[in-house]
């Protein structure tokens, strides 16, 4: 979730130097890289990995940086069940269901079919469900303040699966390389020297104390019919819709009790099958206006 351009800029600055000052100590850079995940499938929390030697005592240390833009909000996205378990523990599903129940009524009033544009939601959008993500602060109607103390899991990657904690650095597995110990939050345009980097690092231990409030956020996963696509066919859904035909019209049931057990592509296929039952082809010459008078009265729409 970091900014790739800023990461590259930071590494390019550091490639040009051999030593730097931080906290009144002088360090020599031994290795500079970005940890990756063995086998792919996600990222570690560390964006910039630096192996250094403290010149005052010749001891080697690690500086593992998580970079964020000042405007950042989300601290976890594309959450799947394995990540939810790493964050919450074995009761992860029950915890998410409790969060959902707090705002259940808010889901029920959200439009599911958009016959007109609404804010950033385009005309022709049809909701398939809602992704489960996390913000360090938020006030959205489909957001719930998380009661559990999960700051260390979110910021430091505590409790993560081994491949996300022990990243691959230049071809070698380095224990805990995916658990950052510093955070850098600065506008990319203000990063021009090594002092801009090391002078603005905040230890993760300190950050956890000031950024411990985290919000569970449910974001709509919409099929954008005018572009014949959704953003990601394998997004895991916290809440999802089971589309069906009722009295010859498109209706749905909300599935609140199976968070992160369903991906977005099967929900699109479900919608496609239902529309074919009432003579509408979602993939060929589809226009959202074809659904007018075809939506069951129980389904909220935006017109």
PLM regions: where:
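Active-site beta-strand-loop-beta-strand hairpin of nuclease catalytic cores
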Residues: 42, 49-67, 71-72, 250-252, ...
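Short, solvent-exposed mixed-charge patches
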Residues: 1, 302-303
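Catalytic cores of nucleic-acid endonucleases
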Residues: 22, 58-266, 270
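Catalytic centers of nucleases
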Residues: 1-86
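Short, flexible coil/linker elements and helix-boundary hinge sites characteristic
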Residues: 18, 107, 119, 279, ...
């Amino acid at each position: 979730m970091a900014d790739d351009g800023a990461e590259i800029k930071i590494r390019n600055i550091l490639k040009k130097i051999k030593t730097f000052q931080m906290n009144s100590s002088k360090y020599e850079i031994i290795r500079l890289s970005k940890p990756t995940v063995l086998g792919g499938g996600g990222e570690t929390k560390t964006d910039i990995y630096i192996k250094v030697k403290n010149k005052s005592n010749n001891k080697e240390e690690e500086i593992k940086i998580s970079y964020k833009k000042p405007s950042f909000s989300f601290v976890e996205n594309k959450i799947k069940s394995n990540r939810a378990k790493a964050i919450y523990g074995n009761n992860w599903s029950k915890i998410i269901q409790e969060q959902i129940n707090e705002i259940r009524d808010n889901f029920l009033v959200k439009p599911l079919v958009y016959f007109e544009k609404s804010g950033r939601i385009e005309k022709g959008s049809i909701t398939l469900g809602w992704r489960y993500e996390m913000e360090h602060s938020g006030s959205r109607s489909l957001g719930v303040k998380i009661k559990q103390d999960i700051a260390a899991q979110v910021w430091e990657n505590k409790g993560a699966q081994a491949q996300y904690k022990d990243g691959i650095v230049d071809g070698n597995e380095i224990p805990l390389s995916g658990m950052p110990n510093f955070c850098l939050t600065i506008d990319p345009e203000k990063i021009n020297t090594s002092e801009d980097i090391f002078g603005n690092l905040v230890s993760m231990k300190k950050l956890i104390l000031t950024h411990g409030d985290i919000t569970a956020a449910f974001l709509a996963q919409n099929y954008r019919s005018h572009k014949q696509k959704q953003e990601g066919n394998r997004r895991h859904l916290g809440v999802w819709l089971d589309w069906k035909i009722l009295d010859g019209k498109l209706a749905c049931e909300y599935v609140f009790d199976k968070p992160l057990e369903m991906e977005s592509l099967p929900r699109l296929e479900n919608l496609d099958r239902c529309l074919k039952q009432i003579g509408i082809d979602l993939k060929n010459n589809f226009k959202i206006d074809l659904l007018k008078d075809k939506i069951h009265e129980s389904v909220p729409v935006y017109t």
